[in-house]
Amino acid sequence: MAKPRVYELAKVLNVDSKTVLEKLKDMGEFVKSASSTIEPPVARRLKAEFAKDNAKGDSKPVQQRRPAAPSAPASTSSSAPTPAAPARQASPASAHQQAPTPGAPTPRPQGGARPGMPTPGRHGQNDNRENGRDNREGRENGRQSRPNDRRNNDRRNNQGRPNNGQPVQHQNNRGNASAPRPHAQGGAGANGGNAASNAIPRPHAQGPRPGNNPFSRKQGMHTPTPGDIPRPHPMARPTADNGRGGRPGRPGQGQGQGRGFRGGRPGQGGQGGPRPGQWGHNRPGQGGGSQGAGQGGARGGFRGGQGGGNNFQGGGAPSNGPARGGGRGGRGGAAGAFGRQGGKSSKARKNRLAKRHEYEELKAPTIGGVRIPNGNGQTIRLRQGASLADLAEKINVNQAALVTVLFHLGQMATATQSLDEETFQILGEEIGWNIQLVSAEEEDKELLQQFDINLDEEELQDDEDLKPRPPVVTVMGHVDHGKTRLLDTIRKTNVIAREAGGITQRIGAYQVTVNLEGEPRKITFLDTPGHEAFTAMRARGAELTDVAILVVAADDGVMPQTVEAINHAQAAKVPIVVAVNKIDVPGANPEKVRGQLTEFGLVPEEYGGDTMFVDISAKQNLHVDKLLEAVLLTADAELDLRANPDMDARGATVEARLDKGRGAVATVLVQQGTLHVGDAIVAGTSYGRVRAMLDENGQPMEAAGPSTPVQVLGLTSVPTAGDLFLVASDDRAARQIAEKRQATERAAQLAKRRKVVSLEDFKKKFAESEIDMLNIVIKGDSSGSVEALEDSLMKIEVSDEVGIQVIHRGVGAITQNDVNLATVDKAVIIGFNVRPNRQVADLAEREGVEIKYYSVIYRAIEDIEASLKGMLKPEYEEVVTSHSEIREIFRSSKFGNIAGVMVQDGEVKRGTKCRILRNGVATVNDLEISSLRRFKDDVQSVKEGYEAGINLGTFNDIELGDIIETFEMREVERK
């Protein structure tokens, strides 16, 4: 059913739209304008409220405003009764000739509405009946004057009713010109539906839809008209007597001619109007036509009169009886047609769902004119970066309602905008829900479970499926303590020669074979950077490793990055083997290193602890085999290194880069299962199919088991170092997982960017807007290097006046898009081990974009720090340059007073700032030496010990003995 609009209801209720809007506001409903739609339950409540108001307004007696019609005693004879009041003839001509007299009823117009009555519309036929008059005294008089047993009188009088077709004179007790329904005469029959006018109106419910009535000419819903203007229905017209009676109500009682009118409502006086549609047929609830004179009132109570006809009882009271209060007409049955037969027309039956919905609406709190179901403290879980649309779907409410509630809480957001956790908590407290945002790990698990991937169940493996795997060893320590040299010695390679600046700037993964007691054992090594900028890399390496080798130089001892490496290993609960390196260097003191590490919980075995210390020299290859043996012994003693090689591969991304010829290349470490060429994999937000696998020496591989580092080719994009990878069932599933992760990550970033600015923080935010920002675009050869460089640059703190903002970072060569982005945002491009092609370099030169190239990370940090210092606003300090004593004053009509001075110290220059000191007190500041002469010559400066003439422009207040002090403002370097 279509939702009605406010102006439509105003037309139905015969009031203006403003009155309806005020009534809705009093009812607690939020409606914006007259063209707004409202729900059907609200419309029914509104009609009921107006009905109550009309009942209260019409409850005063109306007999004081009009004379009551005289009544005549009822006649029990079978002849036509004498009317109780002067009656008019039923012919149309007599209706126009007679004039109303005091004390007599006003004649009613034929075939249409009475004067002053509103034009009936489709929506207003049932509702206009509620404008009837109420007169309790008249109703009591009617009750006293009627017989005690009406049914017996009906049965006796029906046998003797005349059937000669003569018009029946009837009385109209309605003195008011306006009436709720139009009335007309029904041919030659009598108006048997006339009722008393002094009854109490009752609000009635709208009947069933016309589509359920097989006897109605209008089926289905109301067809809208232009402007939704109600069209009048045809009224009853005088018709000839066709000899048909009304619809039978009870068999065995008299024959009626003509058509009766519908009985009045309970407590409502007056004649009932005809029903549009079936002319000449009466339905249950309509007064049946009867032959003979007299007024037939409708039956009282809630049951309407019954149709009259051949030997059937009419719907009105006996012809010789007094008028009674009209009853509510009942809806007729369809006799086997649609739905239940018969039934009362009070209200359509509500199913349980509708009743429950209304009950919940009553319980729901009203916030800002909308109703939200109260959660009563129930917990609901949302993902990171969720929006109001997600919350509305969870709690089954309208999105616009949540937007309205949030607006009334002082925050503005759209339905699809990502919100932070604080905003959700405020909103949840208001509507009674405990909103919790799940962590990224739990959200990723729920995402994988949608694709039948359960990581928790896969970790629970049977012992029969587990097989031994090589240990993963991470080499950690301070920069330049010999980590890479140790790996070169083990692998018999020279990796350190290929590193820029002699320091490691990426994680290297290798696998070597070591003979332990004549048995070949494999060990996987991860070489982590030791520079302070690579903290994230070291932490990631500690999470992937089984055993950590802590390399400490015997000559330097414990350094800051050494302590950091210890903290990473202890946080990951990884056993540590200490390698005291450079024991061949003069000044080496291994015992000092042991004593320093004891303070951090690493107690050597010789001191009664459980940490193995090995003194080595990686450069001279001394005791390296003992170190490897200690690593294997520690792994065998403290760890259970087993994995299932038969399951789908799971692991972590160690490093990733963008190769010009091969695309995205990711170095991954397989932790569970076996990775094969052709598998569909997902690594973070990247996905693809394994086209090729290479080992650390560049040799192709077909399969990689647990604890095996390999380089994977075939990903669509460069993953982030540290992302977990897994094998999906097919390419489609891999793509869907990656795309959903991208959407989740993007929503989480948008939620972080959205910051709610309160009035307290407004000044702080305004001050931050005045900070000069250095925009930077970072491009590097690997994701780990880019991450380390970004973290290092963001840690630079020069002053509160300047800051750094990384607007873009990526892996690969510098492209045209990077230059365009830097042009718009006035940014500087930093290329870390990458270069642009010729066309991109020319474009950057034309656009004036600065590109800086670096291969060592600490040089990039130093240059950016210097650039930030150069962006600082200059600071100036006052520097006194000279003092000159006034010894003579020369007065000139053209130049004013001229001071003859002796320069005591410094150098006086023309155009410099000066002040006058009189008795050690500065009388005037911010003066300027406008002219400077040495005798008659204009000079630029005069040095100490010389005389000069100084003119101070328009300032003439000088005296002998005053001191002219010159000064200048010099810029001071910011630190």
UniProtKB/Swiss-Prot annotation:
Region (G4): 581-584
Chain segments annotated as coiled-coil in the UniProt record: none
Binding site for GTP: 477-484, 527-531, 581-584
Region: G1, residue numbers: 477-484
Region named G3: 527-530
Pfam families per record: EF-G_D2, GTP_EFTU, IF-2, IF2_N
Occurrences of domain tr-type G (ranges): 468-640
Biased composition regions of type Basic and acidic residues, renumbered to the chain: 47-59, 124-157
Localization, UniProt: Cytoplasm
Location of the region described as Disordered in the Swiss-Prot/TrEMBL record: 47-359
G5: region residues: 617-619
Bias-annotated ranges (Low complexity): 64-101
Keyword list, A-Z: Cytoplasm, GTP-binding, Initiation factor, Nucleotide-binding, Protein biosynthesis
Molecular-function GO terms, alphabetical: GTP binding; GTPase activity; translation initiation factor activity
Biased composition (Polar residues): 167-176
Compositionally biased spans, kind Gly residues: 243-275, 285-342
Function: One of the essential components for the initiation of protein synthesis. Protects formylmethionyl-tRNA from spontaneous hydrolysis and promotes its binding to the 30S ribosomal subunits. Also involved in the hydrolysis of GTP during the formation of the 70S ribosomal complex.
Alphabetized HAMAP family for the sequence: IF_2_B
Protein name from the UniProt record: Translation initiation factor IF-2
Organism of origin: Bifidobacterium longum (strain DJO10A)
Name of encoding gene: infB
